């Protein structure tokens, strides 16, 4: 058989649109960042992954995994981070890799505030990939694979169709919202909550990070609130936040499907 036909209409697909198979969802956060005592160091990426996977399950889009790297502003010192260039380089590799299976639209779900500057570089990254897209395949086996992909995904190799969007969600660091989401998705440890205070762990609300508070008035404002209002863990609230994130992300999938 020269070509193999995939049943693109099978299974649960948003609006019963098989073009959703050309959309990939990527989670971006931070793997190495302190979040007090009741949340793990990889809270951000776990939240982003949970949202991204549920968006993929709900719509039929492809879940493409996570971005390993993360960046942060120099004045915020609560973890181990990479440069903005490191993230863009990794994103380029991920996008090029998955474009080989017919994906040409990519939604990045970011749950780490330090990655905010990535959004400023998305259009530039998109143009770079469009201008440098190359089909791999030198052996007969590789060329046969490409032929089968092209048969099922007619836009394969059409660089003008490559489209990247980023949706960011931000909450006060290791405070009520993240704790409530953490409880809902199973990463919060209730037995460690009694020590989860900014007095014990300065990164909570950035209360104990003077350089961050001095350099960013929004961080300082949030820190003052955290100092005066103790964190509250509410699983129902966490569920509401997750539902909101998933639904807002799904709208991006719908926007992708409307593109010609």
Swiss-Prot record:
Annotated source species: Methanococcus voltae (strain ATCC BAA-1334 / A3)
Functional summary from the UniProt entry: Catalyzes the hydrolysis of the formamide of 2-amino-5-formylamino-6-ribosylamino-4(3H)-pyrimidinone 5'-monophosphate (FAPy) to form 2,5-diamino-6-ribosylamino-4(3H)-pyrimidinone 5'-phosphate (APy).
Cofactor binding summary note: Requires one Fe(2+) ion for activity. Requires an additional second metal ion that could be Fe(2+) or Zn(2+).
Name recorded for this polypeptide: 2-amino-5-formylamino-6-ribosylaminopyrimidin-4(3H)-one 5'-monophosphate deformylase
Family affiliation: Belongs to the creatininase superfamily. FAPy deformylase family.
Subunit structure: Homodimer.
Keywords assigned: Hydrolase, Iron, Metal-binding, Zinc
GO biological process: F420-0 metabolic process; riboflavin biosynthetic process
GO MF annotations, alphabetized: 2-amino-5-formylamino-6-(5-phosphoribosylamino)pyrimidin-4(3H)-one formate-lyase activity; ferrous iron binding
